[in-house]
Design a protein with these regions (language model features):
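Active-site-proximal segments of metal-dependent phosphoesterases and phosphodiesterases across multiple
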Residues: 185-204, 223-241
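Structured beta-strand-rich core segments of catalytic domains in phosphoester-bond hydrolases
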Residues: 2-23, 70-193, 299-303, 336, ...
Length: 411
């Protein structure tokens, strides 16, 4: 076994962060489904390093080490979720949500277990799951009135059974709410149009769901919603702080939003443009030769102000050289997008050891159990205007009270 790399560092983006602001740490990783980890695809990887039992232990150790609030994992098969990840992560305070790709529904129960999909884990002692939704791109496209009769939908979008998961959560302690999205787009480089259509469908659903979530009722009796515990005989958990009331949001763009995953798209793609700019015009090179209803007639857009968390270190020595590292391809295709009006980046997980990479032409290997690397960012939830106004009013009121009651003569 070759010597290990030096550990990846967390790169501080903002040093002066108010301790009163709530922090959220988000981790995203395509873990390479066991079914795809074959010697024919990864002939350069030692056989034992490709073995699922070995890779699983490396993956779980990495998740334990990073200790994020949210884990967005792609290429997780149903059996890996049920048998391996959920039980082990439950010991680390995580609860999970998983859906396999759509093909699982057409298979026998046994075969369906090996189908990969997306898994989202969250710290059960810190967050309550209010809602979860599965987004199946092919079935949504084929049922859209403006798309269902178009050949390009049948021939290009429909055969790809990629999915996304949308979770709506609330902090037990502060009542702050978040929308967390985990997505895995199609990989085929010849299907750039399909990737941006999938992204358009995703953001359309995020927009509609966020409108619904802005009207979501407050959580009653938070104390009654159980916190995941250990085994019988374990010491009781420490007493919980008094939970705060559910926060209220006036519109869909006010709720903090995080969109993570394997987008299989580089920075020069229409997918990146749509996420970062909020719009892709109908005459975009990756769309102009196809017919996808209103998406190719009017363009694709979403109302959120999103930024790639790693954009903060672009052009610096700490810039990520890739997130996917194979002999034929090395580039950034995985992202953590965040809503800039509600969240600020505090730090991100830096690149792998550069000297080590010179010795290692590709992943997976003994130290990196998947062909993708992990990405992680920590955020603070921005203070809200009404809260600030409330605090200012309370302060002014207190000052007036102390001023009028002090007996100090006024000029």
């Amino acid at each position: 076994m070759p010597p290990p790399p030096t550990p990846r560092k967390e790169i501080v983006i903002q040093e002066d962060v108010s301790p009163s602001l709530e922090r959220v740490k988000v981790f995203s990783w395509n873990v390479l489904c066991d079914k795809y980890a074959t010697a024919s695809t990864y002939g350069y990887t030692p056989t034992r390093a490709l073995n699922w039992d070995y890779r699983k232990s490396c993956i779980l150790e990495e998740l334990r080490l990073r200790d994020a609030d949210f884990l967005a994992l792609q290429e997780v098969s149903t059996d890996a979720f049920k048998e391996d990840l959920s039980p082990a992560l439950a010991q680390m305070d995580y609860k999970g949500v998983h859906w396999p790709k759509s093909r699982a529904r057409t298979m026998s129960e046994k075969d369906a277990l090996t189908v990969d999909g997306c898994a989202m884990f969250y710290k059960g002692s810190k967050y309550i799951l209010l809602d979860k939704q599965l987004i199946e791109f092919a079935s949504i496209a084929i049922n859209r009135p403006d798309m269902k009769n178009q050949h390009d939908v049948f021939n290009r979008v429909m055969p790809k059974d990629n999915i996304a998961i949308i979770c709506f959560l609330e902090s037990r302690l502060t009542g702050a709410r978040l929308i967390l999205v985990n997505v895995h787009l199609t990989w085929d480089s010849a299907l750039a149009d399909v990737k941006v259509i999938q992204t358009g469908i995703l953001m359309e659903h995020v927009t509609k769901l966020a409108e619904k979530y802005a009207r979501w009722p407050a959580v009653k009796d938070k104390k009654m919603i159980t916190v995941p515990g250990g085994d019988e005989g374990d010491p009781p958990p420490p007493p919980q702080a008094e939970p705060g009331p559910s926060q209220e949001y006036r519109s869909n763009t006010e709720i903090p939003l995080l969109v993570c995953g394997d987008f299989n798209s580089t920075e020069d793609s229409s997918v990146y443009e749509l996420m970062s700019m909020g719009r892709v015009p109908p005459d975009h090179l990756e769309l102009s030769n196809y017919h996808y209803g209103s998406f190719t007639r009017d363009g694709i857009e979403h109302p959120f102000s999103l930024r790639d968390a790693y954009a903060h270190i672009k052009g610096t020595a700490e810039e990520l050289p890739f997130t996917n590292y194979t002999p034929g391809f090395a580039d950034v295709i995985d992202y953590i997008w965040y809503s800039t009006n509600t969240l600020e980046v505090v730090d991100v997980l830096g690149p792998p050891d550069a000297a080590y990479l010179k010795r290692m032409p590709a992943f997976p290997n003994w130290h990196f159990p998947a062909d993708h690397i992990q990405i992680m960012a920590e955020f603070v939830i921005k203070g809200r205007k009404e809260k600030k106004q409330q605090q200012q009013q309370q302060q002014q009121h207190a000052e007036r009270e102390s001023g009028s009651g002090s007996g100090t003569p006024r000029a």
